[in-house]
Amino acid sequence: RATQAEQFLIDARFPYAIGYGLTETAPLIAGAIPGRTSLGSTGPVMDGVSARLENINPRSGEGEIVVRSPSTMIGYYKNPEATKEVFTPDGWFRTKDLGLFDSRGYLYIKGRLNNMIVGPSGENIYPEEIETVINSHFLVTDSIVKEEKGKLVALVHFNREELERRYYSMKEELGNKMDEIKSDLMRYVNSKVNKFSRISVVVEQT
């Protein structure tokens, strides 16, 4: 829903700044001041910070964001194993976030490395992107997308108050109506995502 909130600010002509960082990078990696933001982007890399992508997917141009700067931590306190895990051999910090740069050098966060699902033909599928689309539906409050037996399954919390308000005259039939509502949601989502990111099942969560 972050992109929706950002679009709202743009439509309202409300000035805003944006930034991206982690505690370990103390804290900013990239950012943009009002007037220089770009929808969906965290902005360019900050002065004094170096960032690059590792293990880039040749199809999408996406890769893990790794950074180096004077403000990046030198390690976790008394935990050399964890420290070793988050640094590359040449000393860059692994954010475990996936992203890409556009031609202007603006950074776009695509998802978490640990959450990424690999499609049947090697596609990178980001549950967060699909969840954003699902959550933009007016009957949805929250969702989680996961992979089960090679299919993408959406676990969805519906807005029960809105459902009952909309279908008040047939409240007793709402249970039967849910199959149609879930099918409509699936069509809505699949019309807005890549072919390999289409969901196959919607499961209502209560």
PLM regions: where:
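Conserved ATP-binding/catalytic segment of the ANL
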Residues: V45, R59-G119, S136
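Conserved C-terminal "lid"/linker of ANL adenylate-forming enzymes
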Residues: I117, D142-G150, D184-T206
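A structural signal for short hydrophobic beta-strand segments in well-ordered beta-sheet cores
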Residues: A51-L53, D97-F101, V145
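Gly/Ser/Thr-rich phosphate-binding loop
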Residues: R1-T37, S50, T141
